[in-house]
């Protein structure tokens, strides 16, 4: 196998997000449920025998924080693989949205190259590499929606009685974006939420908890409030995902979403029972 085309990288929604503390090193401790949705970036991979890693959609110098290239190089370094790859990314998931697009791209890169380069790493081995790339990347390797704790490193798949029921969601990304660092460094951020339980979440699912980052994000980005108010005008209860600026609401009745501001991204999404690449890795 010398190439893989049309490899999906799904977005996520945080059904709730509680900040429960802060470690001495400054990292915040979180609790959240990460839910996979069918809004996907699409990646393409072609093996190169010279060991180089390139991106066809970036004609200028690669940014130092490009997660897709970092993921490929981290996998090379961890395994000593001499092969390279040429990567294309068709971006559909908006950036600075709290939807995890960049992290999902990195995870799909690890899964695809593990297969293309015939490395046969387990899910846990890929998880160790993913931890070096960013807090959300390990989740996208776990194969399904999950309960996530710590700094994103404690991940439990939602299965059996805790599995999420099928549902549709209106996802709205305002024109403005947000830098995650601005929110977590803000003095007004709530950092002492009580710890939740999976059983407590399972009792209400899509109505559980809140997003502790949302008040700060709304103060920094008024468009978030505008988007939530727009959803409420449709009879939908909106909340922010991740660190924003995207918001979402479960769709429980017929609703017309065609009058949103032209600069907003509005998409109706369904949750995914499993990651589309869940069976590409064992363990």
Swiss-Prot record:
Gene3D superfamilies: 3.30.230.10, GHMP kinase, C-terminal domain. The active site is at residues 12, 136. Its EC number is 2.7.1.148. Signal peptide: none annotated. GO terms for biological process: isopentenyl diphosphate biosynthetic process, methylerythritol 4-phosphate pathway; terpenoid biosynthetic process. ATP binds at residues 94-104. The keyword ATP-binding applies. Keywords: ATP-binding, Isoprene biosynthesis, Kinase, Nucleotide-binding, Transferase. It catalyses: 4-CDP-2-C-methyl-D-erythritol + ATP = 4-CDP-2-C-methyl-D-erythritol 2-phosphate + ADP + H(+). Pathway: Isoprenoid biosynthesis; isopentenyl diphosphate biosynthesis via DXP pathway; isopentenyl diphosphate from 1-deoxy-D-xylulose 5-phosphate: step 3/6. One of its GO terms (molecular function) is 4-(cytidine 5'-diphospho)-2-C-methyl-D-erythritol kinase activity. Catalyzes the phosphorylation of the position 2 hydroxy group of 4-diphosphocytidyl-2C-methyl-D-erythritol. PANTHER family: 4-DIPHOSPHOCYTIDYL-2-C-METHYL-D-ERYTHRITOL KINASE, CHLOROPLASTIC. Belongs to the GHMP kinase family. IspE subfamily. This is 4-diphosphocytidyl-2-C-methyl-D-erythritol kinase. It comes from Acidovorax ebreus (strain TPSY) (Diaphorobacter sp. (strain TPSY)). The gene is ispE.
